[in-house]
Amino acid sequence: MPSAASTHVGARVTAQQWGWQHAGQNSWAVSELDLDIEAGQRVLVLGPSGSGKSTLLLGLAGLLGGADEGHETGRLLVDGSRPADRRGRIGMVLQDPDSQVILSRVGDDVAFGMENFGVPRAAIWPRVDTALRSVGLNLPVSQDTSTLSGGQKQRLALAGVLAMNPGLILLDEPTANLDSEGVLEVRDAVTAAADASGATVVVVEHRTQTWLPVVDRVVVLGPNGQVVADGAPEPTIARQREHLLQSGIWVPGAPPPRISRRRPAADEPLLSAIDLSVGYPTAPVRAGLDFQIRRGRVTAVTGRNGTGKSTLALTLGGLLPPQGGRLCAQAPFAPSPRRVEPIGWRSKELLTRIATVFQDPEHQFLTGSVRDEILLGPKALRHNSTETAARADELLDRLRLSHLAHRNPYTLSGGEKRRLSVATVLITRPALIVLDEPTFGQDRRTWVELVALLSEIADSGTAVVAATHDDEFVDLLADDRIELQ
């Protein structure tokens, strides 16, 4: 969320016994945190999913709200003042890129923060151009922001922050939706900006290998948001290696365990794409696609940001009409011989045939609790309540959500939201599951557990399609691959 004025001195961060408890919750997201970050330092914050990393960044950005949104203890300061009083010094890239795209044109969105802080108009557009180039977003400034992919929106959000030369740059999984080349471009853009301005950088990221070479310090948070390790990157990782692995933190040189697949004997096709074109009436994205989605097989959809992975996923899910060619279901997968195109199926017909997990999990939440969210689909289908309740309990346990069953889905961490969105589609046992970035926001432990669950689902005969940038996911699970160029 861009909120920084031009300055060339890094900000100092201080936490003194700081804690935050979200409204209506019994547990603390962060508890008794003591932390001091010197001006100009670059700090990588690690911790298992749900350890309060995002809450800490939101607190530093002054975005946690007042007493009606939660309870605060201790002190959290930026340059000796409350973060809300220092917003002209702070720029944050949120975990969800959609939530900080404000205006309809790329250039206007980057310029928005500078306009609010009174930067002279003559200086704004050169800074817009520089920021867009620095993050590798080579698009016209007039480009409609609604046409951007998730990864492009992440770059746009970062450009808006860097254009304002903040003293404190806060990054919450800034590369989660980026391809491998984009990850390095964004990291290098951040380090170049910090080199030029002296800004303090605090980055939260599950995958450590990208950021370890460019940070001065690693801070590891435990389950309650307390510091359990703090120091220079290499010695801290080496000294705490076993503890970090047991806590579910990704450690360089420790790949996830191999998963043994037990593929079903029959792999008949469920969907066939014939010269398929996907996109929107005014914005075609991809044409000439020919492939089959088969029962019990995992198909990975890969490619650089902006190549149409999410658009293809929505089309396969029956949520976006093809722009050309055909997407046909095979009997008996189709509701009837005359209704073979998923775009024409009713919502209840989709629930048991094709279920889709969106790139942004919040786009599919409709209820006020985690458990109710999982039960929503079965209720619509009027499934047996006893069997459904048992299945919901099983999924809550498998996806480490049992202790959050009564939480509002919107108060979960990014990784928890992703696992909940997966649970909501598995509960109805569809024949085909379409997932957009299924491993987003996962620590090592929850990643392994989620991938193992999807492997079991595929082995049971369910077809799985995953649009992903996660090479390890592809290597472990994919039987087939659709590479979009």
Give each language-model segment a name:
Residues T73-R86, R326-E349:
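ABC ATPase NBD Q-loop/coupling interface
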Residues L162, V425-L426:
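ABC ATPase C-loop
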Residues I169-E173, I433-E437:
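Catalytic Walker B motif of ABC-type/P-loop ATPase nucleotide-binding domains
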Residues A61, G317:
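Helix-to-loop junction immediately C-terminal to a conserved catalytic motif
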Residues L158, V186, V422:
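Hydrophobic anchor residue at the start of the ABC signature
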Residues D144-L148, Q152, N408-L412, E416:
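Conserved ABC ATPase signature
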Residues G225-I249, E472-L476, L484-Q485:
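Conserved beta-strand-loop-alpha-helix hinge in the C-terminal portion
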Residues A122-P140, T386-L404:
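Conserved ABC ATPase "signature" region
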